[in-house]
Amino acid sequence: MSKRRIAPLTFLRRLLLRILAALAVFWGGGIALFSVVPVPFSAVMAERQISAWLGGEFGYVAHSDWVSMADISPWMGLAVIAAEDQKFPEHWGFDVPAIEKALAHNERNESRIRGASTLSQQTAKNLFLWDGRSWLRKGLEAGLTLGIETVWSKKRILTVYLNIAEFGDGIFGVEAAAQRYFHKPASRLSVSEAALLAAVLPNPLRYKANAPSGYVRSRQAWIMRQMRQLGGESFMTRNQLN
């Protein structure tokens, strides 16, 4: 009887290990490949597209146009750093002080959860993982973040982030966002336009770049002040990000 009970558990354990090993090979290969090859689509894009189809929205298209950093306005990279991760050039994927502050805040305010994800973590999550807040996903995100921080340069991380970030319903990447909202290529985005796009990033399905609320306008102004305090374009040059 005991052998019959143990056998299924052993099978499940081996199956789980094989799945994890296969995922590790898949993700590791993806990290290596996308260190030099443009990203055709992300996990978030695939998730949005499949959800739309399952919901009967057959006209939905998760649209993205890959562009190199040379074809992106330096203001755009600076804007997302100012908005999302001002220590991006310094850390190895995790902003520990920010994580500690977020944990302390969330203990006091359970109804208003604050995140502390760096651009590296967001890139790993958007590229390879699903939406959610489970400990499993967080653990996988941490491993993938270490992987891309080890293999990719900071410039590459920022380039991929800007090409797969969600800026609105079906709008992925800064080139698609620039064309949709401002009718111009990403290379020609101004300071204020870049700050406006960065202002919707906390929740691009709630906040609209083409119909900005008072909160979005206020956040846009704050981001522009932070961009100046960081040093403007010289920040990007100094940290070899453009």
UniProtKB/Swiss-Prot annotation:
Pathway, per record: Cell wall biogenesis; peptidoglycan biosynthesis
GO molecular function, one term: peptidoglycan glycosyltransferase activity
E.C. no: 2.4.99.28
SUPFAM superfamilies (alphabetical): Lysozyme-like
One of the GO BP terms on file: regulation of cell shape
Keywords from the named record: Cell inner membrane, Cell membrane, Cell shape, Cell wall biogenesis/degradation, Glycosyltransferase, Membrane, Peptidoglycan synthesis, Transferase, Transmembrane, Transmembrane helix
Catalyzed chemical reaction(s): [GlcNAc-(1->4)-Mur2Ac(oyl-L-Ala-gamma-D-Glu-L-Lys-D-Ala-D-Ala)](n)-di-trans,octa-cis-undecaprenyl diphosphate + beta-D-GlcNAc-(1->4)-Mur2Ac(oyl-L-Ala-gamma-D-Glu-L-Lys-D-Ala-D-Ala)-di-trans,octa-cis-undecaprenyl diphosphate = [GlcNAc-(1->4)-Mur2Ac(oyl-L-Ala-gamma-D-Glu-L-Lys-D-Ala-D-Ala)](n+1)-di-trans,octa-cis-undecaprenyl diphosphate + di-trans,octa-cis-undecaprenyl diphosphate + H(+)
InterPro entries: Glyco_trans_51 (IPR001264), Lysozyme-like_dom_sf (IPR023346), PBP_transglycosylase (IPR036950), Pep_trsgly (IPR011812)
Gene this protein is translated from: mtgA
Glycosyltransferase found in the keyword field: yes
Family: Belongs to the glycosyltransferase 51 family.
Transmembrane segments: 19-39
Classification via NCBIfam families: mono_pep_trsgly (TIGR02070)
Membrane topology, from the record: Single-pass membrane protein
Localisation: Cell inner membrane
Main subcellular localisation: membrane
Protein's name in the database: Biosynthetic peptidoglycan transglycosylase
Function text: Peptidoglycan polymerase that catalyzes glycan chain elongation from lipid-linked precursors.
Signal peptide feature range: none
